C-alpha cells in the first residue's frame, strides 16, 4: 500500500513534533506500507525549507518515493478542485495529492483531513 504523507506531517516532523516522528516510524516499519509523497508536496517542503534544515530535510525526503504528476493526475485533480473548492476550500496542491492517491490506490496521511473530502479517497489523520 502506498502511504502518501502530506507535507504538513513532513513539516511537523522536521520541526520536532514527536507524534509526526512516531507516525513515520510506524509507517516505515509496516511491511505492507511504502512511503510516498507527491511531487507537488515534495516541492512544498523543499521550496520553503529553512537553510539550517536543508540536510535534515533532504535526508528525510530520501526515505520517500515521489510520484510524478501526469496529465491524467492533473485532469482528475482539476475535477476534484472544481467539485470541492467551492464547498471545502481545497487548494490545487491538495487536489493533486488526492488525484495521485486515487490513481495509484494509495492512502493519504495528513493532519488536514478537511482538505480531502472526496468520499473515494482513503484519508487517515496522522495522530
Regions found by a protein language model. Give the residues of each.
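Short, hinge-like loop/turn segments at secondary-structure boundaries
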Residues: 51-56, 84, 124-127
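Short, well-structured N-terminal submotif of metal-dependent ribonuclease cores
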Residues: 1-37, 46-59
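Active-site neighborhoods of divalent-metal-dependent phosphate/nucleic-acid chemistry enzymes
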Residues: 66-111
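Histidine- and aromatic-rich ligand-binding microenvironments
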Residues: 6, 37-38, 90-91, 112-113
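Alpha-helix capping/helix-boundary segments
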Residues: 9-10, 41, 73, 96-97, ...
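Acidic, PIN/NYN-like endoribonuclease modules and their adjacent C-terminal/linker elements
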Residues: 2, 98, 102-127
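Short active-site oxyanion
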Residues: 1, 31-35, 63-65, 102-107
Amino acid at each position: 500500500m502506498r502511504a502518501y504523507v502530506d507535507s504538513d506531517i513532513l513539516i511537523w516532523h522536521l520541526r520536532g513534533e514527536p507524534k509526526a516522528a512516531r507516525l513515520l516510524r510506524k509507517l516505515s516499519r509496516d511491511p505492507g506500507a511504502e512511503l510516498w509523497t507527491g511531487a507537488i508536496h515534495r516541492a512544498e517542503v523543499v521550496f520553503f525549507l529553512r537553510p539550517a534544515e536543508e540536510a535534515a530535510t533532504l535526508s528525510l525526503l530520501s526515505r520517500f518515493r515521489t510520484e510524478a504528476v501526469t496529465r491524467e493526475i492533473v485532469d482528475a485533480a482539476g475535477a476534484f478542485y472544481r467539485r470541492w473548492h467551492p464547498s471545502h476550500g481545497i487548494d490545487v496542491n491538495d487536489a493533486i495529492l488526492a488525484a495521485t492517491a486515487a490513481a495509484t490506490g494509495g492512502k493519504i496521511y495528513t493532519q488536514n483531513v478537511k482538505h480531502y473530502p472526496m468520499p473515494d479517497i482513503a484519508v487517515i489523520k496522522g495522530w
